[in-house]
Amino acid sequence: EHLTKKYGEKTAVEDLSLHILKGEIYGFIGHNGAGKTTTLKSIVGILQFEEGEIRIDGDSIQENPLACKKKIAYIPDNPDLYKFMTGDKYLHFIADIFGVDEHTRQERIRKYADLFEITSDLAHPIASYSHGMKQKLAIIAAWIHNPELIIMDEPFVGLDPKASHILKGMMREVCDEGGAIFFSTHVLEVAEKLCDKVAIIKNGKLIRSGTMGEVKGDDCLEEVFLELEGE
């Protein structure tokens, strides 16, 4: 609600209000520098902000950050993983942080590593991984504690078409089970096909948000986005 974030004199995000409901895939669209990453980092508690309030299922990120962080997972646009660890060790490390029991974590690691076809790679150091493999590992780590809200910054960058298709299915599964997804993207075709709702941000201000039908009407999302960007 009414989020404002400044860097010195520069306002990166101004009076932004969004409501993400359970069961929704919510896309966040804007050009580079529009304020997408700043908004996401504020929601997950990485950045402090000047004005407004952020609540995750009733808990304030400022007043009760631990309770909030247990309910969410965040994948940044360039995940900073512990390169000296093997993929498997890293996933167990994340599972330890969130208190995931041994049986559940093994089940989830097996399920998602098999889906992404990186099971054999988990024994190798993360330093040897390609960008796409690191992205897959970050996705599995985000899913490992079954969070209520998953927040992702450009999650499809670096993924091959098959992995992108798998991730879309995983996102829909989260929402079908009562969770929610909020992700930024500049791939408008993905947003149009995948999202229940979208928000468009320009120069730190929310300029349009709602269901896909409300935002784009009879036009395609790309036309609406380019028109709004040009105003």
Summary of predicted features, one role per range:
Residues 209-210:
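ABC ATPase "signature
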Residues 92, 96, 103-121:
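Conserved ABC ATPase "signature" region
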